[in-house]
């Protein structure tokens, strides 16, 4: 409201001094700024090779990842005219996240249904109010079994990589679209009434003119200049917790550990059931939080405008560090093998089993039939939320905006004529309101009056029209990242669930993806040399190829041997061929939901960052409600009219005067004729101060005053109380899928798993037709010496053939069983003659194995023979008896930490989880610096007239004035 100090200076109303700034208003609720989206998760690494370990029990659920960083707040949108309630618009950018609330209890996993066809997009409905969070229902039964996926060999998880240094701040992103205007803030308390100004110097007394008629009540004086803007309000209390962020990006993969030497190759066993997923690693430390940008100047609280278009997706937050490896679960029971189900999606690799002790080199058995696919295990329940990280450091206030242009100056009123000083009469009755007269000229400033007592604050005026929106400020620089907060405490592990019934076997599925090749076994030691056989009798002509033999009966299965001691680690061999796909494991039961973790302690307050550039100019504030007219003050006696004096110095504002008692109304005097205008006389003596006259009628509003320059910024006031908790917002729409990241580097090969027990040997298939000789292979390792056969009869020497090109040495053959001793034939004595090559003798029975001879020199390569025809496939033998399950091997030592891999492509954003209960209010932030005041708006309606101050003491009489003209 505008304060007035009306003085008896020829009936002219003089504006009084401006009052002091009002107190700081209460903080408004948090505005709906954008909420940042979590970065995309990285692509899973390549699964390592190794046999499948035994299935362990479901481990305790891991902790959830951290929320993403908040996006930049949007600029305030322009205020639109109030219209009817329309349909719900597109979602706007989310606001800055508040303190993270406690996570609600997770529901049990329901049955996974088949994806239906996408329906047409319906029009968005109007938002309904959020209901109160329901109580947690009873635990449901386990969901239906999902389609089994092909399980790859489990690779060992590498250790966490070293924490990377914080990167340089990224470039400043483009300014988001205008956000929605915040809710109307709480009504500020009225400031104290300004002190009464000191009186100006006494004007020169004019000669009394003829008595003029009683003029009508003059119009109200011009409104005073706008008061200085009040100090900036304290920061509002943190808003209620935002919705949980999307899952964070997957951490970088560790460096590939060195491959250990492979052990000797054991017998091929049946694929074991896939192991359970290990415990989730400990929660990584959250990434550094950026310094909050400078807040813009407070905008005017206007009516809610139309909903704006959604803003661009926020930048993805930095990926969190990869958690440490979880502890290995206990082995579970064997699942019942069902028929092979359809090929499912590729499952995540299970943990690698420990490396077993090398056993003795066994004979290579025939490949057994692939086992049936097992049932897929049910996913584990999500773990409790981690503790809330410490709040980031408070950002500095933005730079003040430029002052607004001054308003137009109002018209000056016409100066009225001074009337003669009449005798002090009895106070008359209050007259009726007269016709408004012409505006009078501005009189000289009087002396500063004494400070009156403070009056009661007037009620707030009605809201004025909204001003034009100021120009947008330049975006601030991105702040440096703050220090990383302490890691949250790990949640308590959940209790183990009750095992459920086995599901029905699934339908037969397609063949799974090809597994990674296993490690090549170490060559076994050579066998002992047998005794040299005696010379056999000369054989006859070679016989024709015999008919294929009948298939032998399968032998009885031998008893399982005890596990041997752990052997030394062998040298690394080449990569072996791909193994058969393993069976899917039986679906595990969903474990109970663990309790939510305790809330973390708030972190230390961060230091203020450098001052950012000026924020956007705030919108014009709403003018206050028009105050009600105050009670009329006591009427004073009119003093002698004074001449125009020099304006006095601006006095210090005094306290408002106390309200005086109203005098009795006096009778209205007759209206006299107007007198002639007299010359301005010499200043007369100052008359005694008259008593208060009757209250004047309320004048019409005066012309608008000139807008004064903006005042200096006030000191920051104390922080206000936290605002009320806002109504819980509706569930936000699903965010857009983030950009695909770069493919990460393959993970390190895990340690080899424990070898399984050898399975029974299957029935031998029928012998295939002998194919044509194939291409001669390269020279292999020298084989064990075969048994020496009986020597053939010496034939005549043939003519020597041409020497062919040297051929590659073929692979060594396995040692055959010792043959029976051949019959000794008669030897031909005498000097050997050179004869022709005789016919090839018949092959004699194999003799006993002779001693191993030294390896011969590599012969010349022979010509390449034609490629042999593919032999017929033998009949499939009966499935062998399932072997005993091997004992679990010891846990191998952890490998060295791996180097971080590249960022993988982001997966599709998951649906937003259920909103948790609101968290407790955080500690208030540090008061920011005051911004420059915004442009001054047009003057509001005239406020109520202040109460009259107490009557001052009479002044000294002035000097007599000169006589007037006749």
Curated annotation (Swiss-Prot):
Which residue positions carry a glycan here? 100, 882
Spell out which residues are annotated as carrying 5-hydroxylysine. Answer: 100, 265, 340, 575, 686, 870, 882
- Localization of this protein: Secreted; Secreted, Extracellular space; Secreted, Extracellular space, Extracellular matrix
For bias type Low complexity, the affected ranges are 114-130, 148-166, 214-253, 373-399, 408-427, 469-496, 608-622, 635-662, 691-707, 736-755, 852-866, 900-933
Location of region: Disordered: 1-966
What Pfam families does this protein's entry cite?
Collagen
- Where do Gly residues bias regions lie? 320-329, 824-835
Give all 3-hydroxyproline modified positions. Answer: 709, 938, 953, 956, 959
- Phosphoserine PTM positions read 8, 106, 611
Predominant place of localization: secreted
- Biased composition annotated in UniProt, kind: Pro residues: 168-180, 664-676, 805-815, 951-966
Keywords from the UniProt entry = Extracellular matrix, Glycoprotein, Hydroxylation, Phosphoprotein, Secreted
GO cellular component, as recorded: extracellular matrix; extracellular space
Q: How is it modified after translation?
A: Contains mostly 4-hydroxyproline. Proline residues at the third position of the tripeptide repeating unit (G-X-Y) are hydroxylated in some or all of the chains. Contains 3-hydroxyproline at a few sites. This modification occurs on the first proline residue in the sequence motif Gly-Pro-Hyp, where Hyp is 4-hydroxyproline.
In which residue ranges is the amino acid composition biased (Basic and acidic residues)?
Answer: 64-78, 867-881
Which tissues express it? Answer: Expressed in bones.
Q: Which residues carry this modification: Allysine?
A: 7
* Residue list for modification 4-hydroxyproline: 27, 30, 32, 41, 44, 47, 61, 76, 82, 91, 97, 124, 127, 133, 142, 148, 169, 178, 181, 208, 211, 223, 229, 238, 244, 247, 262, 271, 274, 286, 295, 310, 316, 325, 331, 349, 358, 364, 370, 379, 382, 391, 400, 406, 418, 427, 436, 439, 457, 475, 481, 487, 493, 499, 505, 517, 526, 538, 542, 548, 554, 563, 581, 596, 602, 623, 629, 632, 641, 647, 665, 674, 683, 695, 701, 710, 719, 722, 746, 755, 773, 782, 785, 791, 806, 812, 818, 826, 832, 897, 900, 918, 933, 939, 954, 957, 960, 963, 966
Report quaternary structure and partners.
Trimers of one alpha 2(I) and two alpha 1(I) chains.
Q: What's this protein's family per the entry?
A: Belongs to the fibrillar collagen family.
Name it: Collagen alpha-1(I) chain
């Amino acid at each position: 409201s505008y304060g007035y100090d009306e003085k008896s200076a020829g009936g002219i109303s003089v504006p009084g001094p401006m009052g002091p700034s009002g107190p700081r208003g209460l903080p408004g609720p948090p505005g709906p700024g954008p909420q940042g989206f979590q970065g995309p998760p990285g692509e899973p690494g390549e699964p390592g090779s190794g046999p499948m370990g035994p299935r362990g029990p479901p481990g305790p659920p891991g902790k959830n990842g951290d929320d993403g960083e908040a996006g930049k707040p949007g600029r305030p949108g322009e205020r639109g005219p109030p219209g009817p309630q329309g349909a719900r618009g597109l979602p706007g950018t989310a606001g800055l996240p508040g303190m993270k609330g406690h996570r609600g209890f997770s529901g049990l996993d329901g049955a996974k249904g088949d994806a239906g066809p996408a329906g047409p997009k319906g029009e968005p409905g109007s938002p309904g109010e959020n209901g109160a969070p329901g109580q947690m229902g009873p635990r449901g039964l386990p969901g239906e079994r999902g389609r089994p996926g092909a399980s790859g060999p489990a690779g060992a998880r590498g250790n966490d990589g070293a924490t990377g240094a914080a990167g340089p701040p990224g470039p400043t992103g483009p300014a988001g679209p205008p956000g929605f205007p915040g809710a109307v803030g709480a009504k500020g308390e009225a400031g104290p009434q300004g002190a009464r100004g000191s009186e100006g110097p006494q004007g020169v007394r004019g000669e009394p003119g003829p008595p003029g008629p009683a003029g009508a009540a003059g119009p109200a004086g011009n409104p005073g200049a706008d008061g200085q803007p009040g100090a900036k309000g304290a920061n509002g209390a943190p808003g209620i917790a935002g919705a949980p962020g999307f899952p964070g990006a997957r951490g970088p993969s560790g460096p590939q550990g060195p491959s250990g030497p492979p052990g000797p190759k054991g017998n091929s066993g049946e694929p074991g059931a896939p192991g359970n997923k290990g415990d989730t690693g400990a929660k990584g430390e959250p990434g550094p939080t950026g310094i909050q940008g400078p807040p813009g100047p407070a905008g005017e609280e206007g009516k809610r405008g139309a909903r704006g278009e959604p803003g661009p997706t926020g930048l993805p937050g930095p990926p969190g560090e990869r958690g440490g490896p979880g502890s290995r679960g206990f082995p579970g029971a064997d699942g019942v093998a069902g028929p092979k189900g359809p090929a499912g999606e590729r499952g995540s690799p299970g943990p690698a089993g420990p490396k077993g002790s090398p056993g003795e080199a066994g004979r290579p058995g025939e490949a057994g039939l692939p086992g049936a696919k097992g049932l897929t295990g049910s996913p584990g329940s999500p773990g409790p939320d981690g503790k809330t990280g410490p709040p980031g450091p408070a950002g500095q206030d933005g730079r003040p905006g430029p002052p607004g242009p001054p308003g137009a100056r109002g018209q000056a009123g016409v100066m009225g004529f001074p009337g003669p000083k009449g005798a002090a009469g009895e106070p008359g009755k209050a007259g009726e309101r007269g016709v408004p007269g012409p505006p009078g000229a501005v009189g000289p400033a009087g002396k500063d009056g004494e400070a009156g007592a403070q009056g009661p604050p007037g009620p707030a005026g009605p809201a004025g029209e909204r001003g034009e929106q100021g120009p947008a400020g330049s975006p601030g620089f991105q702040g440096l990242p703050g220090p990383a907060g302490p890691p949250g405490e790990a949640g308590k592990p959940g209790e183990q669930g009750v095992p459920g019934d086995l599901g029905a076997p699934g339908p037969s599925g397609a063949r799974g993806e090809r597994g990674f090749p296993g490690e090549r076994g170490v060559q076994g030691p050579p066998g002992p040399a047998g005794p040299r056989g005696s010379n056999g009798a000369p054989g006859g002509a070679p016989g024709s190829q015999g008919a294929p033999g009948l298939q032998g009966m399968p032998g009885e299965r031998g008893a399982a041997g005890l596990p041997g001691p752990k052997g030394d680690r062998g040298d690394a061999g080449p990569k072996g061929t791909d193994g058969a796909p393993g069976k899917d494991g039986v679906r595990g039961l969903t474990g109970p939901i663990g309790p939510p973790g305790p809330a973390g302690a708030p972190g230390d307050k961060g230091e203020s960052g450098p001052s950012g550039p000026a924020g956007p100019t705030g919108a014009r504030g709403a003018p206050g409600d028009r105050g009600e007219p105050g009670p009329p003050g006591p009427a004073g006696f009119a003093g002698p009219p004074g001449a125009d004096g020099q304006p006095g110095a601006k006095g210090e504002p005094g306290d408002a005067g106390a309200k005086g008692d109203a005098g009795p109304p006096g009778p209205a005097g007759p209206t006299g004729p107007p007198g002639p205008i007299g010359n301005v006389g010499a200043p007369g003596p100052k008359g005694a101060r008259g008593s208060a006259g009757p209250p004047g009628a309320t004048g019409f509003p005066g012309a608008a005053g000139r807008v004064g320059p903006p005042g200096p910024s006030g000191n920051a006031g104390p922080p206000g109380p936290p605002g009320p908790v806002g109504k819980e917002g509706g569930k936000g729409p699903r965010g857009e899928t983030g950009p695909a990241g770069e493919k990460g580097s393959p993970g390190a090969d895990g340690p080899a798993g424990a070898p399984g027990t050898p399975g029974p040997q299957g029935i031998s298939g029928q012998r295939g037709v002998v194919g044509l000789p194939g291409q001669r292979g390269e020279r292999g390792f020298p084989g064990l010496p075969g048994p020496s056969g009986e020597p053939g009869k010496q034939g005549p020497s043939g003519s020597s053939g041409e020497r062919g090109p040297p051929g590659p040495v073929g692979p060594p053959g396995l040692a055959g069983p010792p043959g029976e001793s051949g019959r000794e034939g008669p030897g031909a004595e005498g000097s050997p003659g050179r004869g022709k090559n005789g016919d090839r003798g018949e092959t004699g029975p194999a003799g006993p194995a002779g001693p191993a001879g030294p390896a011969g020199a590599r012969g010349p390569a022979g010509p390449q023979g034609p490629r042999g025809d593919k032999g017929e496939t033998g009949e499939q033998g009966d499935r062998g008896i399932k072997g005993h399950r091997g004992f679990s091997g010891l846990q191998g030592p952890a490998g060295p930490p791996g180097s971080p891999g590249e960022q993988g492509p982001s997966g599709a954003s998951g649906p937003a989880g259920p909103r948790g209960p609101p968290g407790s209010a955080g500690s208030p932030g540090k008061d920011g610096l005051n911004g420059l005041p915004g442009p001054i708006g047009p003057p509001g309606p005239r406020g109520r007239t202040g109460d009259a101050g107490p009557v001052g003491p009479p002044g000294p009489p002035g000097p007599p004035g000169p006589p007037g003209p006749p």
